[in-house]
């Protein structure tokens, strides 16, 4: 009788374990997640908010007249003159090689970002998995406050970074993407210094934070890189923040459906003293303006 009882308990335990495993498989497999749902609701809310709508019109020579010559040449070469002043840009990447850091694993991720132009605002969503377990991330910047959240198994928050350094990092990331959404460049809170015919330093001040970096252009005046010292790479055990150069690289410019030239490839790099770490390496799947 005792043996029969033990077997029943074992069968019950196995049944419960199998049910839990099946439940997890279903939970992991469905598209829904609380973080993704929050991202979608934020995008819907922001796109409906009139503060984030431009006044319309088109990008003209007169509108870009105050910009440095290299920036004007970039806007002209890429075909933005005569196109609508966009309220936002949506950029999508698929199967990006994403490094978790030095001597850490590399994941394949899907990445979707929105840059809004009437007010500095950036939202981005990471979708990936680690050993079959969903891993998702959400980068957000709105009203001068930014953060980064990472969630494992759609339920457990493993990264949740906020603070002034994150605010500044989000602002400089927003600035780095402005050549692909040139309505941003028409704002009066960005100043420029043309250091030579192929390099322009840009400084943006918003909500009490200032971030800057250098845009570099090739001979065709396609933007090929943006480098800044305003991104924190780590905080040590004593609470000291460490900053090293951070670079966005663009290339492979192609004509989009609306005729403008846009980069097809993008890398994001930490320029460590002992060598570069390319932590984001992917091809641009789509760019949509609204």
Feature locations, PLM:
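Membrane-interacting alpha-helical segments
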Residues: 21-47, 220-236, 290
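N-terminal Sec-pathway targeting helices
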Residues: 2-21
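N-terminal cleavable signal peptides for secretion/export
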Residues: 26-111
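Flexible, processing/modification-adjacent segments and terminal tails
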Residues: 149-208
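Gly/Pro-enriched, hydrophobic low-complexity segments
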Residues: 202-289
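N-terminal mature ectodomain segment of secretory-pathway/periplasmic proteins
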Residues: 72-156
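Short, exposed beta-strand/loop patches in secreted or surface proteins that constitute
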Residues: 111-117, 138-140, 188-195, 214-216, ...
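Short, hydrophobic/aromatic-rich segments at coil-to-beta transitions
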Residues: 86-90, 117-125, 194-203, 224-225, ...
């Amino acid at each position: 009788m005792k043996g029969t009882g033990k077997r029943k308990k074992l069968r019950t335990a196995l049944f419960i374990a199998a049910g839990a495993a099946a439940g997890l498989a279903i939970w992991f497999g469905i598209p829904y997640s609380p973080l993704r749902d929050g991202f979608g609701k934020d995008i819907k809310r922001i796109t409906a908010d009139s503060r984030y709508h431009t006044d319309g019109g088109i990008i003209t020579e007169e509108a870009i007249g105050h910009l440095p010559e290299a920036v004007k040449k970039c806007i002209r070469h890429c075909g933005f003159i005569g196109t609508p002043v966009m309220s936002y840009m949506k950029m999508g990447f698929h199967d990006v090689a994403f490094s978790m850091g030095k001597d850490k694993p590399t994941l394949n991720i899907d990445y979707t970002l929105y840059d809004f132009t009437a007010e500095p605002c950036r939202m981005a969503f990471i979708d990936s998995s680690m050993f079959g377990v969903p891993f998702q991330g959400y980068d957000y910047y709105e009203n001068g406050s930014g953060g980064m959240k990472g969630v494992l198994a759609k339920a457990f928050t493993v990264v949740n970074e906020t603070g002034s350094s994150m605010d500044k990092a989000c602002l400089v990331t927003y600035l780095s993407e402005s050549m692909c959404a040139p309505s941003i460049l028409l704002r009066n809170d960005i100043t420029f210094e043309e250091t030579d015919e192929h390099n322009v330093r840009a400084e943006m001040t918003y909500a009490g934070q200032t971030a800057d970096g250098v845009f570099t252009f090739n001979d065709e005046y396609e933007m090929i890189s943006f480098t800044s010292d305003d991104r924190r790479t780590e905080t040590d055990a004593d609470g000291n923040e460490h900053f090293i150069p951070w670079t966005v690289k663009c290339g492979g410019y192609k004509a989009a459906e609306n005729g403008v030239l846009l980069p097809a490839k993008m890398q994001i790099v930490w320029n460590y003293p002992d060598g570069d770490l390319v932590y984001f390496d992917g091809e641009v799947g789509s760019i949509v303006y609204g």
